[in-house]
Amino acid sequence: MSFIFKFIATFVRKMLELLQFGGKTLTHTLSIYVKTNTGKTLTVNLEPQWDIKNVKELVAPQLGLQPDDLKIIFAGKELSDATTIEQCDLGQQSVLHAIRLRPPVQRQKIQSATLEEEEPSLSDEASKPLNETLLDLQLESEERLNITDEERVRAKAHFFVHCSQCDKLCNGKLRVRCALCKGGAFTVHRDPECWDDVLKSRRIPGHCESLEVACVDNAAGDPPFAEFFFKCAEHVSGGEKDFAAPLNLIKNNIKNVPCLACTDVSDTVLVFPCASQHVTCIDCFRHYCRSRLGERQFMPHPDFGYTLPCPAGCEHSFIEEIHHFKLLTREEYDRYQRFATEEYVLQAGGVLCPQPGCGMGLLVEPDCRKVTCQNGCGYVFCRNCLQGYHIGECLPEGTGASATNSCEYTVDPNRAAEARWDEASNVTIKVSTKPCPKCRTPTERDGGCMHMVCTRAGCGFEWCWVCQTEWTRDCMGAHWFG
């Protein structure tokens, strides 16, 4: 009955909008697809303030069912009736899964095939959408155990992706499906707690109801595993096959760590995969990539491809997900791909055509000195000296100026020691950090007034926390204590 009243109220409001704005309706209605495990797909318009009970009351009659016979699954969770649409992080043309509840006897058989400790239950936490319960994957286990309710709000998971459609760094949404049938009517037995849970296979089991016969992982009837993937949150969904590359090194700077290059404290940063977890802002990361690209200082890695390490020179710090380099411009990324291809040819014992404007990669026999650029410019050259092919010994190389590796991107060791994610404070940062306007040394403020004194030996600059300039009488009068 409550749904009928809400429906009438919504209809009246829409009519008033139509009369007031001459046909230009102002509405936040979401057009959503509802899929069943019997092959049906419905298109419904949902108001953000509606709850899941309203959705069931709208969908059930179209399926010839009662609302109590349905359950709604989204992003790995069975949603409770009290969950509202606006809590679910839905976008236009998102997909909800409406599954008919199985008879009690049938449900009992399915549940008995799963491990008792992994059996999902619809507790308050389990019935909330994944975006409401998932904590930031950068948090350590100890931080998760000791987190308070106030800290939990700030530590909700936030993801970044490179979207090929938007062609930029975008906010991302985590989604989940069955690893076997790729269906979205899948509920996880637990939330992911680290990036390995999300990026690696066979980490988190769950229950799949995408098909009329539930999926099982093996002949013993073990539950299937979840497959996580990401979508762009900044454009209309392209359906369940929509995908965006996750940039797992880019994070919200919840620890307020300064950039190791410019020392600014940015909201969004990249954390290198080294033991110290050095931090850089996105602009400085682009500058780092651009300068290394200009000098062809990217390195071939047997597992990760053409990549870069931490600029502080840390061991075991190569970037694994090369989609991070798509933060460069399109032209720069095309250049990166060309250099990567050329590097592969050279590593395989090949040569590059030296003719200006060509650069074709050529794989030739080890003892072959005369090389012809086939399928390219047709230039014939000497493999040893890369000059036009000749009879006899190669001419000695000229004494021209040799190339230098004077990189524009440099890292101060003192800054690198301060720009470490692993030594920053935990989830709530009650102590904020800003760089001294004179020497750029990060300075902490833990309450008190806005009059700051740089703690770096030899500096001692007095400055205003608000203005980030030299402390003056104006600062004293306007915001000494905030």
Curated annotation (Swiss-Prot):
Q: Which reaction does it catalyse?
A: [E2 ubiquitin-conjugating enzyme]-S-ubiquitinyl-L-cysteine + [acceptor protein]-L-lysine = [E2 ubiquitin-conjugating enzyme]-L-cysteine + [acceptor protein]-N(6)-ubiquitinyl-L-lysine
Q: Per UniProt, what does mutating K71P do?
A: Abolishes self-ubiquitination resulting in decreased E3 ligase activity
Describe its PTM? Auto-ubiquitinates in an E2-dependent manner leading to its own degradation. Phosphorylated. Activation requires phosphorylation at Ser-94 by Pink1 and binding to Pink1-phosphorylated polyubiquitin chains. Phosphorylation at Thr-187 by Pink1 is also important for mitochondrial localization.
Q: Which SMART domains match?
A: IBR, UBQ
What positions does the entry give for Zn(2+) 6 binding? C382, C385, H390, C394
Keywords recorded for this protein, A-Z: Autophagy, Cytoplasm, Metal-binding, Mitochondrion, Phosphoprotein, Repeat, Transferase, Ubl conjugation, Ubl conjugation pathway, Zinc, Zinc-finger
Pfam families the UniProt entry points to: IBR_2 (PF22605), ubiquitin (PF00240), zf-RING_12 (PF17976), zf-RING_14 (PF17978)
Gene3D superfamilies to which the protein is assigned, alphabetical: 1.20.120.1750, 2.20.25.20, Phosphatidylinositol 3-kinase Catalytic Subunit, Chain A, domain 1, Zinc/RING finger domain, C3HC4 (zinc finger)
Residues in the signal sequence: none
Zn-finger segments (IBR-type): 334-394, 432-473
Q: Where does Zn(2+) 2 bind?
A: C178, C181, C208
How activity is regulated?
Answer: In the autoinhibited state the side chain of Phe-481 inserts into a hydrophobic groove in RING-0, occluding the ubiquitin acceptor site Cys-449, whereas the REP repressor element binds RING-1 and blocks its E2-binding site. Activation of park requires 2 steps: (1) phosphorylation at Ser-94 by Pink1 and (2) binding to phosphorylated ubiquitin, leading to unlock repression of the catalytic Cys-449 by the RING-0 region via an allosteric mechanism and converting park to its fully-active form.
Q: Cite the binding residues for Zn(2+) 3.
A: C259, C262, C281, C284
**According to its UniProt record, in which pathway does this protein act?**
Protein modification; protein ubiquitination
Where is it expressed, tissue-wise?
In oocytes, accumulates in early egg chambers where it is enriched until stages 9-10, localizing mainly to the posterior pole and anterior margin (at protein level). After stage 10 it is no longer detected in the oocyte (at protein level). In embryos, ubiquitously expressed in the early stages (stages 2 to 5) (at protein level). Expression levels decrease at later stages and becomes restricted to the brain and nerve cord from stage 9 (at protein level). Relatively higher levels of expression in the head compared to the body. Enriched in the dorsomedial (DM) dopaminergic neurons.
Kindly give the InterPro entries that the UniProt entry links to this protein: BRcat_RBR_parkin, E3_UB_ligase_RBR, IBR_dom, Parkin, Parkin-like_IBR, Parkin_Znf-RING, Rcat_RBR_parkin, RING-HC_RBR_parkin
Q: What is known of its domains?
A: The RING-type 1 zinc finger domain is required for ubiquitination activity.
| Family to which this protein belongs | Belongs to the RBR family. Parkin subfamily.
The name this protein carries in UniProt is E3 ubiquitin-protein ligase parkin
- Tell me which species this is from: Drosophila melanogaster (Fruit fly)
Name the gene for this chain. Answer: park
